[in-house]
Amino acid sequence: MRPWTGSWRWIMLILFAWGTLLFYIGGHLVRDNDHSDHSSRELSKILAKLERLKQQNEDLRRMAESLRIPEGPIDQGPASGRVRALEEQFMKAKEQIENYKKQTKNGPGKDHEILRRRIENGAKELWFFLQSELKKLKNLEGNELQRHADEFLSDLGHHERSIMTDLYYLSQTDGAGDWREKEAKDLTELVQRRITYLQNPKDCSKAKKLVCNINKGCGYGCQLHHVVYCFMIAYGTQRTLALESHNWRYATGGWETVFRPVSETCTDRSGSSTGHWSGEVKDKNVQVVELPIVDSVHPRPPYLPLAVPEDLADRLVRVHGDPAVWWVSQFVKYLIRPQPWLEKEIEEATKKLGFKHPVIGVHVRRTDKVGAEAAFHPIEEYTVHVEEDFQLLARRMQVDKKRVYLATDDPALLKEAKTKYPSYEFISDNSISWSAGLHNRYTENSLRGVILDIHFLSQADFLVCTFSSQVCRVAYEIMQALHPDASANFRSLDDIYYFGGPNAHNQIAIYPHQPRTEGEIPMEPGDIIGVAGNHWDGYPKGVNRKLGRTGLYPSYKVREKIETVKYPTYPEADK
């Protein structure tokens, strides 16, 4: 039997050796930065891996602390298992460090450099093509002008798809695709652990709670977003979300009859003190806080979208094109875990409809939205983007059939679509369209229909819809939880993505701009631009917050401003 003292020294020796290796490889990376033959992309990848090694070092430190017992044998029981786990992690870490040292010497891979040069050349050739074709158009008239313009747009589409395909393959080279898969999975598991920990306190009678009533006066997508908003505030204020859903207008039995409960251990909203939301600080000593709808919450908490957690921001920016949407998707993912009967319904519907890939999801919202919140869009506007998406997919996979999942509240649309586009295979359930009508909307059958529509839309390879629709935005959010980065897998005919009642959506100017027309606004690098909308023509609308002027500006001259907030990190969730 070895005494603990010797083992503890052994642990400390391992940690010291670990730290020395980290210091060595860190210095090695810094020195290598001076060599011109190393790309900044490769260096960023390696530094990120080094950051993960540091995180593993912290994990080892915590493991060593958990092993620190005053006396007694360690060759059996839990302590022995932890020591063995420590040894395994140490050996893996040594192997990883050696691999990363080799990568810094080798530089980017051959495929990476071939693709990078192909994209560079493609961009140049596109510019040459544009210059040449526009000069030709100047000298054409009438039918000849129309014919040449059509050919020009068709060729331009080929150029764009060629560059986009090269960019896709570039994103997969040198292990980048595998890294992205793993990093997205790790981030998702981390957040889901934290949410699960918060939602399942050991003693419900003592837990701080945030009460959210689901029955906001709107449809399913809107109500789901209302609960997501509540959930984010609960997460930020370290309160267990208590969801009140009795007599829900879609299912009188409540949320739990359709989806899994938001908590397994704490479904009772009672507490020693109760009050309405008056701000995180003022509510500090109130056990149960009732939250109003986002439109009337005051003071506004900092945890509203489009902000993301400070401790995850750097990792999210690297792995995902729209971190704010990814963050929303994590709460949606937790909330819509189906009950067994619903899971079975989804499986049966998948087989019955013949849903399989490749497939484009199309959502056409009509009825109450048209004229009130959105314009009418004929099916032709959707299929333009559907065809573009299929042509892009065909460059990297076999498209045996052009499948389109059509979700709509207009029962007549399916027949119209099949008549106008016989080369497409439309997958749709017209009974869902009938149940989505205004007279049938708030029924359990309608709820089943909208859940199925959202599920299949989120499963599609691309999504074509109007972001003015909550159903479309929910499908897009779920899509983000299914892929490492599906932020670009959409075409919206109207709005950009937004979350109802959020904090401002801002961008930062990276290039100067002098207006050429009366409707444009000037910009200087560093100016904050508040986004008001996007016309999908290269010129969004926004306000220059420094000048107070509203107008159009070139989208390529700005970048997204990622808003971060100091969310709690719930270290207890990892124990």
Swiss-Prot record:
The enzyme's E.C. designation: 2.4.1.68
Topology versus the membrane: Single-pass type II membrane protein
A Pfam family reported for this protein in Swiss-Prot or TrEMBL: SH3_9
Domain of life of the source: Eukaryota
UniProt domain GT23: residue ranges: 206-493
Family annotation (InterPro entries): Fut8, Fut8_N_cat, Fut8_SH3, GT23_dom, SH3-like_dom_sf, SH3_domain
Catalytic activity, as annotated: N(4)-{beta-D-GlcNAc-(1->2)-alpha-D-Man-(1->3)-[beta-D-GlcNAc-(1->2)-alpha-D-Man-(1->6)]-beta-D-Man-(1->4)-beta-D-GlcNAc-(1->4)-beta-D-GlcNAc}-L-asparaginyl-[protein] + GDP-beta-L-fucose = an N(4)-{beta-D-GlcNAc-(1->2)-alpha-D-Man-(1->3)-[beta-D-GlcNAc-(1->2)-alpha-D-Man-(1->6)]-beta-D-Man-(1->4)-beta-D-GlcNAc-(1->4)-[alpha-L-Fuc-(1->6)]-beta-D-GlcNAc}-L-asparaginyl-[protein] + GDP + H(+)
Keyword annotations of the record: Disulfide bond, Glycosyltransferase, Golgi apparatus, Membrane, Phosphoprotein, SH3 domain, SH3-binding, Signal-anchor, Transferase, Transmembrane, Transmembrane helix
Intervals, Cytoplasmic compartment: 1-9
Record protein name field: Alpha-(1,6)-fucosyltransferase
Source species: Sus scrofa (Pig)
